[in-house]
Amino acid sequence: MTKPDIPYSDGFWWSNDGLRLHFRDYPARPENAHRPPVICIPGLTRNARDFEQVAAKLAGDWRVICVDLRGRGDSAYAKDPMSYVPLTYVQDMEALLQEQKIERFVSIGTSLGGLITMLLASTRPGRVVGALLNDVGPQIEPAGLARIRDYVGQGRSFPTWMHAARALSEVQGAVFPGNSVSDWLDMAKKAMKVGPGGRIVYDYDMKIAEPFAVPGGEAGVDLWPTLAGLAPVPVLIVRGAMSDLFSVDTAQRMLGVLPQGRLLTVANKGHAPSLEEPEVADAIATLLGEVDAMALATQA
């Protein structure tokens, strides 16, 4: 898969504890500047590059902001590893929203990014005007959490990109059975970087694993009540059919809380769908159409 040739600018903002954090900013055309921006928030070990294809499809029609959470990508690493928890990420996002003077936005959150989305919606109702929750809900399955605890922060490195891609396929091949060599290479180049010694390394601070070493350290707060913040708006719930992190039961329970919620199950994918799947791209277009329709209804 080739890298989209879509221009973006690199933006930076400061966290409350003095970290310089990074985002990619894909602009909207002037005639679409009235629309709320789409903010993409990645998963635990991931970064802004995960949303290249999504941003390429939406840029121009919408402003798209893809963030690197603290300790990932081009954002600074935290001085205190125990700040690698959802409530701190929410504070960081609050600082971004304030710096960019964003009052309303659409949130696309994968895994951890979805948890952050729910928390942002609950702390100030009305500012999240639409959401995509990618393979995550208020309840995380123990098997998936155990798998994450086993691999995060391992600090592996590889001599070539092909070695890195092969390692990913060995670990995740069972939940992405349809991936080609090109797909694995694309995944590797989004998740990893060339390290100082020339070897391929994961593009995150290995210390993000430290909260997982504390019993209950990754648990945070009960997230079921936060769904109320998304109840008034359109929500697309994407679930990988082979996910071990996000169960069918949790997804169905969420639909009972979200009157405008829709569930899309992506076949032959585990945790988490890339959002580049054709059916997901179509569903994102529908979601944003619903956001537009709600805005027009409010103005009428």
PLM-predicted stretches and their roles:
Residues M1-V38, G60-D61, I102, E279, ...:
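Alpha/beta-hydrolase fold catalytic core
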Residues R24-P30, E52-A59, C66-I108, T286:
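Active-site loop/oxyanion-hole signature of alpha/beta-hydrolase fold enzymes
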Residues I39-G43, R239:
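The conserved beta1-alpha1 loop
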Residues G43-Q53, V64:
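Serine-hydrolase catalytic-loop signature spanning alpha/beta hydrolases and amidase-signature enzymes
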Residues E103-P142:
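Conserved hydrolase catalytic core segment
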Residues P159-V214:
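Conserved alpha/beta-hydrolase catalytic His-Asp/Glu region
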Residues V194-G256:
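Conserved serine/cysteine hydrolase catalytic core
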Residues K269-P278:
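Catalytic histidine-centered segment of alpha/beta-hydrolase-like enzymes
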